[in-house]
Amino acid sequence: MALGFFCLAIFLYLSLDPDSGYTSASAAASGKEGVEITYGSAIKLMHEKTKFRLHSHDVPYGSGSGQQSVTGFPGVVDSNSYWIVKPVPGTTEKQGDAVKSGATIRLQHMKTRKWLHSHLHASPISGNLEVSCFGDDTNSDTGDHWKLIIEGSGKTWKQDQRVRLQHIDTSGYLHSHDKKYQRIAGGQQEVCGIREKKADNIWLAAEGVYLPLNESSK
C-alpha cells in the first residue's frame, strides 16, 4: 500500500510539474467532457463566471485567521492550482471510487498539503466567510468538509459539470467574484464563502490527472 501511494506521488509530480517535461495521458485527455472524477484525482477547479482557477500558495492572510490564503488565479498553467479529491475520515470511499452528488469531500492542496478550509472569520475584501488552507496530511477537522452539489440530474461528478461546494460547518458556498487583490496576490481575485446560492458559486472540474474509475464504481 505504501509503495502504491509513493508511485502515485511520483506519477503526479512528473505529470503536473511544468518543468518536468512529462505530460500524462490523463491530463492530455482531460479536455473531453464526461470524464469521471474519482477520489485521489488531482484537479483544477475553474470558476464558471470568471474562468479563474481555485488557487493557493504559501502566503498567509494579513487579516482574519492568518492562515494560508486561497485565491482565484487567472492563468491555466500553475501547479499551485491543483487539488487532490479526498473522502472524509470514517467513510468507506477509497481511491478510484466515483464521487457522488451529495457526498462530503475534502480538497487537499497538492503543493502545500493543506486542506481547503472555511470558518467564521471575515474574508479580506468583501467581509464574507473566509476560505483558507489549513492542516496537513495528518491534521484535518470538519472545517475541511465540503458537500458536493451537482447542478442538474447528474449522480456522479464529471469533468465540465456545473457544481457547488457547500461548507459543512458554516453552510457557505465556495464563491468567487471579480474583486481583486492589489498587493500580495495582485491580479488574483477573492475566494470566500457565502450562504446564498448565486451564479458566482458555480465551479467546474477542468485540467488534471483523473485516476481510473474502480470497476466496483461502474
Swiss-Prot record:
Pfam families: MIR
Compartments, as annotated in UniProt: Endoplasmic reticulum
Disruption phenotype annotation: No visible phenotype under normal growth conditions, but mutant plants are insensitive to seedling growth inhibition in response to the pathogen-associated molecular pattern (PAMP) elf18 and show increased susceptibility to phytopathogenic bacteria.
GO cellular component, one term: endoplasmic reticulum
Keywords assigned: Endoplasmic reticulum, Glycoprotein, Plant defense, Repeat, Signal
Keyword Repeat: yes
Protein name: Stromal cell-derived factor 2-like protein
Induction statement: By tunicamycin.
Signal peptide bounds: 1-21
Superkingdom of origin organism: Eukaryota
Self-association state and partner proteins as the record states: Interacts with ERDJ3B.
Residues bearing attached sugar chains per UniProt: 214
Gene Ontology biological-process annotations: defense response to bacterium; defense response to fungus; pattern recognition receptor signaling pathway
CDD domains referenced in this protein's UniProt entry, alphabetically: beta-trefoil_MIR_AtSDF2-like
Main location group: endoplasmic reticulum
Domain MIR, chain residue ranges per copy: 34-88, 96-151, 154-208
Functional summary from the UniProt entry: Involved in the endoplasmic reticulum (ER) protein quality control and unfolded protein response. May be involved in the quality control of glycoproteins. Forms a complex in the ER with ERDJ3B and MED37A/BIP1 which is required for the proper accumulation and function of the surface-exposed leucine-rich repeat receptor kinases EFR involved in pathogen-associated molecular pattern (PAMP) triggered immunity.
